């Protein structure tokens, strides 16, 4: 890619969208496909120098992103079109740059973030889908989305999420602050929309797994509050599948003035 190299160092933020179904998660790892590795390779081609990216949230194998944010530093002076159209031309079809923004030195994709937002998409129908099969989680028993929504409201605010935390979670604390959790139905789709300052490992998928039990009338509405109070992962339901989970937005202080495109996923109304 033609362009100038300079003695100055530029810090660039990008919005990234990806279908995680064919990747072993976000994080670069030896001998397996990762979103980070593909993005760094494409950026390095455009920058004509090695690029390392830092992301807002490392998603697991099979999990998707419509609102992932990354930053990197480079001495390459390029037009915005090079960092969007140029990088996209070098990326696989299931990863895309959505926007680019030059950011100040004190910006960090992970540490400057004030909140993350996820959406979990359930295809609630007797028969499984074929199109979008890796972009939704199929659940065949009828679900009561309003019941799920009511049950979930006990999770609001600052709580100990041990009951919804993966055993292998490496976070120093199970405490997180949930800002909203909404469960809504859109035809055959049931959407769990949750925003928090941060998430413990598998937190969204573990919450959804238990909400499915409530929605199917296998557990009472009070069960989620009981699980939260118990602080015991073994009492909660199985972890919901990765396919339905999307990182849809990351919040930053207004002073960074980052773009805010529609959250998606694109087959859902915003």
UniProtKB/Swiss-Prot annotation:
User: Which top EC class is given?
Assistant: isomerase
Question: Which residues participate directly in catalysis?
Answer: 60 (nucleophile)
Instruction: Tell me which domain of life the UniProt entry assigns to the organism this sequence originates from.
Output: Bacteria
Query: Which residues are recorded as binding substrate?
Result: 118
Gene3D superfamilies membership? Pseudouridine synthase I, catalytic domain, C-terminal subdomain, Pseudouridine synthase I, catalytic domain, N-terminal subdomain
The alphabetical list of record keywords is: Isomerase, tRNA processing
- Main function: Formation of pseudouridine at positions 38, 39 and 40 in the anticodon stem and loop of transfer RNAs.
Record-linked HAMAP family: TruA
- Family of this protein: Belongs to the tRNA pseudouridine synthase TruA family.
* Name of the molecule in the record: tRNA pseudouridine synthase A
The scientific name of the source species is Salmonella typhimurium (strain LT2 / SGSC1412 / ATCC 700720)
Question: Source organism lineage?
Answer: Bacteria, Pseudomonadati, Pseudomonadota, Gammaproteobacteria, Enterobacterales
Gene assigned in the entry: truA
């Amino acid at each position: 890619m033609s362009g100038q190299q300079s003695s100055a160092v530029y810090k660039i933020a990008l919005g990234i969208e990806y279908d995680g179904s064919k990747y072993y998660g976000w994080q670069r790892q030896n001998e397996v496909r990762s979103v980070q590795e593909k993005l760094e390779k494409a950026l390095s081609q455009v920058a004509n120098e090695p690029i390392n990216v830092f992301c807002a949230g490392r998603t697991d194998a099979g999990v998707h992103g419509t609102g992932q944010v990354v930053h990197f530093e480079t001495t390459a002076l390029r037009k915005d079109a090079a960092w969007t159209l140029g990088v996209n031309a070098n990326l696989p079809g299931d990863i895309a740059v959505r926007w680019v923004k030059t950011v100040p030195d004190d910006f960090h994709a992970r540490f400057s973030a004030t909140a993350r937002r996820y959406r979990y998409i359930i295809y609630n129908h007797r028969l499984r889908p074929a199109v979008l099969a890796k972009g939704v989680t199929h659940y065949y028993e009828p679900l009561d989305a309003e019941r799920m929504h009511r049950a979930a409201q006990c999770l609001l605010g600052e709580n100990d999420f041990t009951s919804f935390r993966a055993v292998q979670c490496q976070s120093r604390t199970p405490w997180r602050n949930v800002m909203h959790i909404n469960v809504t139905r859109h035809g055959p789709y049931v959407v769990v929309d949750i925003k928090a300052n941060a998430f413990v490992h598998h937190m969204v998928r573990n919450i959804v797994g238990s909400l499915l039990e409530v929605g199917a009338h296998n557990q009472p509405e009070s069960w989620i509050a009981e699980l939260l109070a118990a602080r015991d992962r073994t009492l909660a339901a199985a972890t919901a599948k990765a396919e339905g989970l999307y990182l849809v937005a990351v919040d930053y202080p207004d002073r960074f003035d980052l773009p805010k495109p529609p959250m998606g996923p694109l087959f859902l109304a915003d």
